[in-house]
Design a protein with these regions (language model features):
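Bulky hydrophobic segments
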Residues: 1-137
Length: 137
């Protein structure tokens, strides 16, 4: 397949990846958790980032999968994201901080759930509803 045929695919992947990151950034920037009360407030500040950051990372990798062949399988992207996020969480147990400062096993569970959401969005929603999302490999 020539590059000309892949341009619409690459463009839509860039739009989805960048839009996803902008939504995640806005969610953090506008601090939407401040409008929540009680247990919902605690849950949001404990786990919201653990859910959405893997989704963002998954779609950042999706932006590059046309040109980086090993990223074309959904499970490769999922493994890379889960490994990076889990590594960061485990390092917190040893006082080495990347994405947070307190180790919590539930964060790792939430990473997995976030990645599952990303896969469902990718395979069920985007492949069926977005033109040019699928391409012949």
């Amino acid at each position: 397949m020539t590059d000309i045929n892949l341009k619409p695919n690459q463009r839509i992947r860039q739009i989805v990846g960048i839009s996803t990151m902008l939504v995640i950034g806005a969610m953090h920037g506008f601090r939407i958790g401040q409008f929540l009360k009680g247990d919902l407030y605690k849950l949001y500040y404990s786990f919201a980032s653990d859910l959405v950051l893997p989704i963002g990372a998954y779609f950042l990798l999706s932006m590059n999968e046309i040109h980086v062949r090993f990223l074309r399988k959904w499970y490769i992207k999922a493994i890379i994201v889960f490994a990076a996020m889990t590594f960061s969480e485990i390092m917190q147990a040893f006082d080495i901080y990347f994405f947070g400062v307190t180790f919590d096993f539930l964060d790792i569970v939430m990473f997995g759930i976030g990645i599952l959401f990303a896969i469902l969005i990718d395979k069920l929603v985007l492949e069926s509803l977005v033109p040019h999302w699928k391409y012949s490999k």
